[in-house]
Swiss-Prot record:
Protein name (database record): Protein-glutamate methylesterase/protein-glutamine glutaminase 1
Record GO biological process: chemotaxis
Modified how: Phosphorylated by CheA. Phosphorylation of the N-terminal regulatory domain activates the methylesterase activity.
Gene this protein is translated from: cheB1
Catalytic activity: [protein]-L-glutamate 5-O-methyl ester + H2O = L-glutamyl-[protein] + methanol + H(+); L-glutaminyl-[protein] + H2O = L-glutamyl-[protein] + NH4(+)
Function: Involved in chemotaxis. Part of a chemotaxis signal transduction system that modulates chemotaxis in response to various stimuli. Catalyzes the demethylation of specific methylglutamate residues introduced into the chemoreceptors (methyl-accepting chemotaxis proteins or MCP) by CheR. Also mediates the irreversible deamidation of specific glutamine residues to glutamic acid.
GO CC, alphabetical: cytoplasm
Pfam families for the chain: CheB_methylest, Response_reg
Similarity comment text for this entry: Belongs to the CheB family.
Length: 350
C-alpha cells in the first residue's frame, strides 16, 4: 500500500486528488495539508511514501516547503501545478530544483482529458513512490566525495568535427539538463537537440527556465528550422523531433515510441541516420528504456555516446538500460558531461 500526503490549499482540488488516488486499491491517502507549515508537521507524523505538492500555498510556498522536506525528511514529491499560470510554472521548476521528482498538471473534472490525467497521476504516484530520494539543502555545510565515474575521453585522439549533440532525459532530467547547459560556455559551437519527457503544457515554461540558466539561446523546436551553432532546441509537446541531413528540424505527430511522444529513441535514430559518426548521444536520468537501444546503435556507428552514472541519476532506468547493453562510450556525472562536450567542441582536425 502506497501512503500519500496531499498538500493543497484548495478544498476542491484536495477532494478531487483524494478521489482519484482512492480509486486505486494500491494507494491510500493518509493525510492532507492546507499549508507548507502543516505539511512539514504531517510528513513527520505520517511518514508518507509520497507527497503531492501544490506550489501556490499560503505563507510558505511549494518551493520552500519542498526544500524544507528534502532537508529534514527526504520524501518523494510530485508537483501538481497549473501549466497555464506563469507564476506557478516558475515555482514548479524551482521545486524540481529543490528535489521534487516530477510535475503533473492539476486535473479538472470538467476537462476533456480528465480520465487521462487521472491515470497519469496514479501511474506517477506508483512509479515515484519507489524512488530513493536523498537529503538536500543541509543546514551545515559539508564536503561530499565526488561520485565515481569512468574516465573522460582522450580528446587528443579525436580528429572529427561533431555536428550535433542529441540529449534525452526523463525523471530527474530538468535539473541535470540545467546543470549541463549552464556549465557550457557561451562560445560552445555544437547545436544541441533535447527530448525531455514532461507533462503536456510545461515545455514552454521549462525552456524559459533553461534559457535563463544557459549561456546561449534555448528554444522550443520549430518544424523546418535550421539548427545553428550555439543553440539548444527542445522538442515540443506531443511531437517527435528529428533532424535531416540538411540540418533542419523535422517534427512529426507519429505513434508513441516506448509509450512516449516525443521519444528519445526517435531523436537518436534520426541523428545517427543524418550525421553518422559526426554526432554525440547523451542519455540522462529517467524511468524506462527510451533511447537505450538507439544509443547502442549510435555507439556501433562510431559515435561518441555518454550515459549518466548511477550515483547521480534520480532514476537509473534509461541510462542503466544503455549501460547494461554496453551502449555508452563513457559513464559520467553531469559536471563531467559538460566538460567532455566542451572538449569535443574544440576537437576539430587541423
Amino acid at each position: 500500500m502506497i501512503k500519500v500526503l496531499i498538500v493543497e490549499d484548495s478544498p476542491v482540488v484536495r477532494e478531487l486528488l483524494s478521489h482519484i488516488l482512492h480509486s486505486d486499491p494500491q494507494i491510500r491517502v493518509v493525510g492532507v495539508a492546507e499549508s507548507g507549515e502543516e505539511a512539514l508537521k504531517e510528513v513527520v507524523r505520517l511518514r508518507p511514501d509520497l507527497i503531492t505538492m501544490d506550489v501556490n500555498l499560503p505563507r510558505m510556498d511549494g518551493f520552500e516547503t519542498t526544500r524544507r522536506i528534502m532537508e529534514e525528511i527526504p520524501t518523494p514529491i510530485i508537483i501538481v501545478s497549473a501549466a497555464w499560470v506563469s507564476t506557478e510554472v516558475e515555482k514548479t521548476f524551482r521545486a524540481l530544483e529543490a528535489g521534487a521528482l516530477a510535475v503533473l498538471e492539476k486535473p479538472s473534472i470538467a476537462a476533456r482529458d480528465y480520465d487521462i490525467r487521472a491515470r497519469d497521476l496514479i501511474r506517477a504516484v506508483k512509479a515515484m513512490s519507489e524512488v530513493k530520494v536523498i537529503r538536500r539543502w543541509s543546514r551545515s555545510p559539508r564536503i561530499e566525495p565526488a561520485p565515481p565515474a569512468s574516465g573522460e575521453p582522450d580528446i587528443g585522439k579525436i580528429t572529427k568535427r561533431f555536428e550535433v549533440v542529441a540529449m534525452g532525459a526523463s525523471t530527474g532530467g530538468p535539473t541535470v539538463l540545467k546543470q549541463i547547459l549552464s556549465d557550457l560556455p557561451d562560445n560552445f559551437t555544437i547545436p544541441i537537440l533535447i527530448v525531455q519527457h514532461m507533462t503536456q503544457g510545461f515545455i514552454p515554461g521549462f525552456v524559459d527556465w533553461l534559457s535563463r540558466a544557459a549561456n546561449y539561446p534555448v528554444s522550443v523546436a520549430v518544424h523546418g528550422e535550421e539548427i545553428r551553432p550555439g543553440h539548444a532546441y527542445v522538442a515540443p509537446d506531443g511531437l517527435h523531433m528529428g533532424v535531416n541531413a540538411l540540418g533542419k528540424i523535422i517534427l512529426t505527430k507519429g505513434e508513441p515510441e516506448n509509450g512516449l511522444c516525443p521519444s528519445v529513441s526517435y531523436l537518436f535514430r534520426s541523428v545517427y541516420r543524418a550525421y553518422g559518426e559526426n554526432a554525440v548521444g547523451v542519455l540522462l536520468t529517467g524511468m524506462g528504456k527510451d533511447g537505450a537501444y538507439e544509443l547502442k546503435v549510435m555507439k556501433d556507428c562510431g559515435m561518441i555516446t555518454i550515459a549518466q552514472n548511477k550515483e547521480t541519476s534520480v532514476v537509473y532506468g534509461m541510462p542503466g538500460e544503455a549501460i547494461g547493453m554496453n551502449a555508452a562510450s563513457y559513464v559520467l556525472p553531469p559536471e563531467k558531461i559538460a566538460r567532455v562536450l566542451v572538449k569535443l567542441a574544440g576537437s576539430v582536425a587541423p
